[in-house]
Amino acid sequence: MDVALVFSLLVMFIFFLQISFSFWEKAGGLVAGSADSSIKVSVDVVPSISIDSPSDVDLSPNIQETGSATGSATWNIKTNNSNGWKLEVSALDTPAMKSGSDSFADYTEGTPGTPETWSISSSDSEFGFGASGSYADASFSGNKYLGFDGSNRIQVAHRNAQAGGSGDDTTVNFKAEVGSGHNQPDGTYSATVTATATTL
């Protein structure tokens, strides 16, 4: 065979291979390089708060003519707010504890708005509350009490940090007393108390 012919055929074959390789590369048969594309993935965790609803409270023992009765309710607060929370209580009515047209007076402090050791006049009947627990306001320590102020909220506890994993507990202690010289009409007296948890 003629050498020139062989050479021509070889050149044509090499050219054909080059064309085929180029086509294969463009079709994705080979990756000749790389390209990057970056994105940011984000999520917002917003502050939230919840409070449970404990059972209704029956003060005990029953008051027969004179004497006192006590009871308590514990509220659990959960929040992821890093600044913390506060707990306030209020009453539906003024005075809070009623039975029809009869009532117990809201506890009267010697210094209005300052919790104090429970003490009432023998001629009165009064109803009030205190607070206890790790986050109860220090003013309530030593088993001190306040009177409700109708629907005005009164702070009883706070924490300047997010709640623990199982939430934070605060116990509100209730007390009603009929003085030895007071004639309180019989009946079932009740107070509707609302606890409000708020993020700080």
Predicted regions and their residues:
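Signature of Gram-negative chaperone-usher
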Residues: 2, 19-200
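Bacterial N-terminal signal peptides
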Residues: 7-20
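N-terminal Sec-pathway targeting helices
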Residues: 1-7
